[in-house]
């Protein structure tokens, strides 16, 4: 059974290449991957996904992480409640995403899919602070992206 998803998408900056339906599909792929990786008991996810510009991305990163620059993706994990629903917010900085895609010689859509999957997994409690956690999270991201026809993002271009 598919994990129930409530997704609120907000556009601080518009990008026609990133419509709601596409972002939703990427989040659903991440949820399905997590369900196959031990999150089978997850009843659902209530997530916010906001696309922002450099100024907002920098402000949020400074305010919540103490780092005075815009980063590619920020995730605010609120945990899974007794109802089995994971809650969180994901913020993707579109100009940083676009710059990284160019630098890494990836398509904008492939990199956007990766950052969306990455942020969704963080919202479900995955992390990459410790080496073992990082290997698990990166392996799951790679599997999820492969299901979407996207190459391993951790291989050099």
From Swiss-Prot:
GO terms for biological process: rRNA processing. Signal peptide: none annotated. The keyword Zinc applies. Binds 1 zinc ion. Its cofactor is Zn(2+). GO terms for cellular component: cytoplasm. It is an enzyme of class 3 (hydrolase). The keyword Membrane does not apply. Keywords: Cytoplasm, Endonuclease, Hydrolase, Metal-binding, Nuclease, Ribosome biogenesis, rRNA processing, Zinc. It is found in: Cytoplasm. Pfam families: YbeY (PF02130). Gene3D superfamilies: Metalloproteases ('zincins'), catalytic domain. Its EC number is 3.1.-.-. Zn(2+) binds at residues 118, 122, 128. One of its GO terms (molecular function) is metalloendopeptidase activity. HAMAP family: Endoribonucl_YbeY. Belongs to the endoribonuclease YbeY family. Single strand-specific metallo-endoribonuclease involved in late-stage 70S ribosome quality control and in maturation of the 3' terminus of the 16S rRNA. This is Endoribonuclease YbeY. It comes from Bordetella parapertussis (strain 12822 / ATCC BAA-587 / NCTC 13253). The gene is ybeY.
């Amino acid at each position: 059974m598919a994990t129930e998803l409530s997704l609120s998408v907000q556009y601080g900056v518009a990008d026609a290449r990133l419509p709601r339906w596409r972002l939703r599909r990427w989040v659903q792929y991440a949820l399905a991957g997590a369900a196959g990786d031990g999150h089978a008991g997850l009843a659902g996810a209530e997530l916010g996904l906001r696309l922002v510009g450099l100024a907002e991305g920098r402000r949020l990163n400074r305010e919540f992480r103490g780092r005075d620059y815009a980063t590619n993706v920020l995730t605010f994990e609120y945990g899974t409640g007794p109802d089995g629903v994971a809650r969180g917010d994901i913020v993707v900085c579109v100009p940083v995403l676009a710059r990284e895609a160019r630098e890494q010689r990836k398509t904008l859509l492939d990199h956007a899919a990766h950052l969306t999957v990455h942020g969704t997994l963080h919202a479900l409690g995955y992390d990459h602070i410790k080496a073992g956690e990082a290997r698990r999270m990166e392996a799951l991201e790679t599997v999820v992206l492969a299901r979407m026809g996207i190459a391993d993002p951790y291989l050099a271009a």
